[in-house]
Amino acid sequence: MDIEAYYQRIGYKNPRNKLDLESLTDIFQHQIRTVPYENLSIHCGESMELDLEAIFDQIVRRNRGGWCLQVNYLLYWALTTTGFETTMLGGFVCGSHTDKYSTGMIHLIVQVTINGRNYIVDAGFGRSYQMWQPVELISGKDQPQVPSIFRLREEGETWYLDQIRRQQHVPDQEFLNSELLERKTHRKLYCFTLQPRTIEEFESANTYLQISPSSPFLDKSICSLQTPEGVHCLVGLILTFRTYNYKENTDLVEFKVLTEEEVEEVLKTIFNISLGKKLVSKNGNLFFTI
């Protein structure tokens, strides 16, 4: 695996020897704007691999994306290889509809330490929940970013990441009540501890998310990519464009329903990916928001 191939994949051309917060943010933003958060392999009859070589081949060589375990594992490898001080952490995701955290550790997170300060770097939450900058590991501090305000809070040995969101405007009346829309302005995202993890600890979660009837990743085909203005999401045949803060404290969310024949072209032109196998688009009944 070649680190320069990774940097070419994400379009990063700046110096590699600056291990500061500015460089970390720059690398991170290049990845989230070029590597989609997606689970399309499942809906092409393939498996979501957790082996680093397989992930590198999928994302770097074949120009695909991946879900959190894949894109954050690749980011962890890239930052470590570049020379950053990194730690792999594990998260427990909060369900928006249940307001409860998962019992299993199903989310991979990267911690980066720079000049004694710790930052959470997560390229794999996608949709409008995706951070655009590293979040400093400080309890109770609002950290405003373009997508929203992020806030970490510490209780005992557990850290909780929350999001304070803007209002949203949906111009198409047909989609005002869409179940894909996040209704909460204060959203709990996930919790984690600072215990270092290894990739082997995520193998059971990687399998579970592909086979469990309660997994939204089995229930829905998902592709999400950050843009300079917002985020594009494709869930089944429903394509959305979110523009952050298009007017004061309000996001613009536009919907479009695709035909099966349009999906391949949309993946190429909007998400910059091509699939090697036939995609069976799916948007089942499990709760999932963008």
Swiss-Prot record:
Cellular localisation: Cytoplasm
Reaction catalysed by this enzyme: an arylamine + acetyl-CoA = an N-acetylarylamine + CoA
EC code: 2.3.1.5
Active site: C68 (acyl-thioester intermediate), H107, D122
GO cellular component assignments: cytoplasm
Broad enzyme group: transferase
GO MF, any single term: arylamine N-acetyltransferase activity
InterPro entries: Arylamine_N-AcTrfase, Arylamine_NAT_domain_sf, Papain-like_cys_pep_sf
Claim: Cytoplasm is one of the keywords in the record: yes
Residue pairs linked by disulfide bridges in the UniProt entry: none
Binding site for CoA: T103, G104, Y208, S214
Chain positions recorded as substrate binding sites: I106, H107
Record's keyword terms, sorted: Acetylation, Acyltransferase, Cytoplasm, Transferase
Family per record: Belongs to the arylamine N-acetyltransferase family.
Protein name (database record): Arylamine N-acetyltransferase 1
UniProt organism field: Oryctolagus cuniculus
Gene field: NAT1
